[in-house]
Regions:
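Conserved strand-helix element at the start of the C-terminal RecA-like helicase core
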Residues: 104-115, 288-318, 324-328
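Conserved helicase ATPase core of P-loop NTP-dependent helicases/translocases
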Residues: 140-147, 323-344
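Walker A/P-loop
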Residues: 69-93, 105-111
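Post-DEXD/H (motif II) to motif III coupling segment of the RecA-like Helicase ATP-binding lobe
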Residues: 179, 187-254
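Conserved Walker A/P-loop ATP-binding site and its immediately adjacent core
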Residues: 88, 102-126, 130-141, 160-165, ...
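Conserved helix/coil segment N-terminal to the catalytic DExD/H
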Residues: 137-180, 188-194
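Conserved pre-motif I regulatory segment
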Residues: 12-79
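Walker A/P-loop NTP-binding motif
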Residues: 64, 84-101, 121, 208-210
Length: 344
């Protein structure tokens, strides 16, 4: 069963007040923001404003059903644009579930840089019961993280799908009870899972087996900014994701993907007389890079990792080399960390 219609589900007043207090004390916000979502895509395309608070309450209520052994507990899938505050929608329930029930929330995410950014952002806010494990950590560091998780010092634990599928769950959590599993960047389950990172393709099956092995239920909350709704025209990433992650029964929230603060400026490249295409492209990129160096944060996508470091030297005058850097998967992890920090 896929439920798309927006239905108000309200926490008891005591719980609702606790959620509002966490919003203020941890994040420093007085009120929740609104998300623009479709009311019921099975019937039309009417949009409405959905408070982050309402969605957070639903996540908590589904987790509480799991605690009570209620088999009617739903999973959830949300599509919303980047910048809509999706991380708050699972972090705040995780903090609440940890405080109230000592439950652990697992966040499965494909991108190490995103994991580190979210964990560090929470720590900067003063919340310390969060940790992550990745290949960038030494074995000793990872073992210390697992110890903290097992001993109840961590309520929000980030890891990759490859790591989750590589070990028995007790290796990470010990006797801790899982209250919520979050799949961030959920579109990668289908877009990457078939060929690029195959563990994504088996993630849903693994989570189902995990529930059976543990003998209790917990909701899975999947979030993405880029899944496409197209049930009649093919290439429907939303239903592919629901099927792959075994999310049914699922409460589905489809938000608008258009961001009003993003524009596109497509300009045809000019090739001067006697100039080859490659020379014209190099000249154009070099000119644009010089423009961007005027105090603007800019990301330029290059199709190949190999050769990008040499290309940078041709695009930028030597006096400005310290303002630019290349970033790709095989770069040294210390260098990548320094680049991310400098870009911030």
């Amino acid at each position: 069963m896929i439920e798309s219609q927006i239905v108000a589900r309200v926490l008891p007043s005591k719980c609702r007040e606790a959620v509002k207090v966490l919003l203020q004390e941890v994040y420093g916000y007085e009120d929740f923001r609104n998300l623009e979502v479709y009311d019921d895509l099975f019937r039309g395309k009417e949009k409405l404003q959905l408070s982050q608070g309402q969605l957070i309450e639903e996540v908590i209520m589904e987790a509480e059903k799991g605690i009570k052994g209620d088999s009617s507990a739903h999973n959830l899938l949300l599509t919303a644009p980047t910048g809509a505050g999706k991380s708050l929608l699972f972090q705040l329930p995780a903090i609440y579930l940890g405080n109230e029930y000592k439950l652990l929330t697992l966040v499965v995410s494909p991108l190490k840089a995103l994991i580190v950014d979210q964990v560090e952002a929470l720590r900067e806010l003063g919340y310390e019961r969060v940790a992550y494990a990745s290949s960038d950590l030494s074995p000793e560091q990872k073992n210390e993280v697992y110890r903290r998780v097992r001993e109840g010092e961590v309520d929000l634990f980030y890891l990759s799908p490859e790591l989750l599928l590589a070990y028995d769950i007790s290796y990470f959590v010990g006797e801790r009870r899982i209250g919520l599993v979050v799949v961030d960047e959920a579109h990668t389950v289908t877009t990457w899972g078939k060929e690029f990172r195959v563990d994504y393709w088996f993630l849903g099956r693994h989570l189902e087996a995990l529930k059976n092995a543990l003998g209790y239920v917990f909701p899975v909350f999947a979030l993405t900014a880029t899944a496409v709704w197209n049930p009649e025209g093919g290439n429907d990433m939303i239903f592919d994701t629901i099927r792959s992650l075994h999310l049914a029964p699922c409460a589905l929230y489809v938000g608008t993907v258009k961001r009003e603060n993003i524009g596109f400026d497509i300009t045809a490249m000019t090739i001067e007389e006697g100039e080859t295409y490659d020379k014209a492209k190099q000249r154009t990129v070099a000119a644009r890079v010089e423009d961007f160096l005027d105090g603007h944060k800019t990301i330029i996508y290059y199709p190949f990792a190999g050769g990008i470091d040499i290309k940078l030297k041709t695009w930028v005058y030597p006096a400005n080399w310290h303002w630019v850097a290349s970033y790709y998967g095989k770069k040294d992890k210390e260098q990548k960390a320094e680049i991310i920090q400098a870009f911030k």
